[in-house]
């Protein structure tokens, strides 16, 4: 939209200047929001790296212990044990709001973890240990999923915030500033013309006297 399409009146000039101040205030708020989002993202990124390393180590231990159990019991026996245990794990999901951004929360319902899934069966201690390790690893994996989803949500909000700032800098604010400048220029010209006309009228009146 051209700034010349705005009617050059004093009221419009006052309104434009007021809107320019408001736009600059909004931009400052968006810039503050961007800084806070970046801070949260850095924190989540650090936490993600920490938990990821923990998960990698735990899973490595799980596989190592599990393979020892397989070597001890035999793969077919382990498969029979696994098939005899019904699925019971339940994961609860919810949403929390962080600085206006919806963040997913994922929790394992620990009451759904079977305490003695193998009953009174004689089973390799390696399998029992790997199961305990996997239970811990699963909780960490859920934490990792939650952090990753949070990073994705915060990154999306950051991109949206940056687009708004860019729109203000490249389109909105320049339009209002050029419109204000155009109206001021027209009003100044009118003032000068009015002043010149008054001078001429005064001279004419003086001559008639």
Swiss-Prot record:
Annotated HAMAP family: ATP_synth_D_arch (MF_00271)
Name of the protein in question: A-type ATP synthase subunit D
A GO term from the CC aspect: plasma membrane
Record has Cell membrane as a keyword: yes
Disulfide pattern: none
Gene Ontology annotations of biological process type: proton motive force-driven plasma membrane ATP synthesis
Assembly, per entry: Has multiple subunits with at least A(3), B(3), C, D, E, F, H, I and proteolipid K(x).
């Amino acid at each position: 939209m051209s700034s010349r399409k705005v009617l050059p009146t004093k009221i419009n000039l006052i309104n434009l200047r007021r809107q320019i101040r408001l736009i600059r205030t909004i931009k400052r708020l968006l810039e503050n929001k961007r800084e806070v989002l970046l801070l949260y993202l850095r924190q989540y990124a650090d936490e993600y790296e920490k938990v990821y390393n923990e998960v990698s180590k735990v899973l490595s231990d799980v596989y190592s212990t599990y393979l020892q159990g397989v070597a001890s019991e035999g793969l077919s026996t382990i498969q029979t044990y696994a098939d005899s245990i019904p699925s019971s794990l339940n994961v609860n999901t919810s949403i929390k709001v962080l600085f206006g951004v919806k963040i997913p929360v994922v929790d394992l319902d620990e009451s759904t973890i079977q305490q003695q899934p193998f009953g009174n069966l004689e089973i390799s201690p390696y399998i029992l240990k790997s199961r305990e390790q996997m239970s811990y690893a699963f909780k960490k994996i859920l934490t990792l999923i939650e952090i990753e989803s949070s990073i994705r949500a915060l990154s999306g909000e950051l991109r949206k915030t940056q687009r708004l700032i860019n729109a203000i800098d490249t389109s909105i604010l320049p339009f209002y500033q050029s419109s204000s400048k155009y109206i001021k220029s027209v009003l100044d010209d009118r003032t000068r013309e009015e002043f010149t006309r008054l001078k001429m009228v005064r001279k004419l009146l003086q001559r008639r006297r």
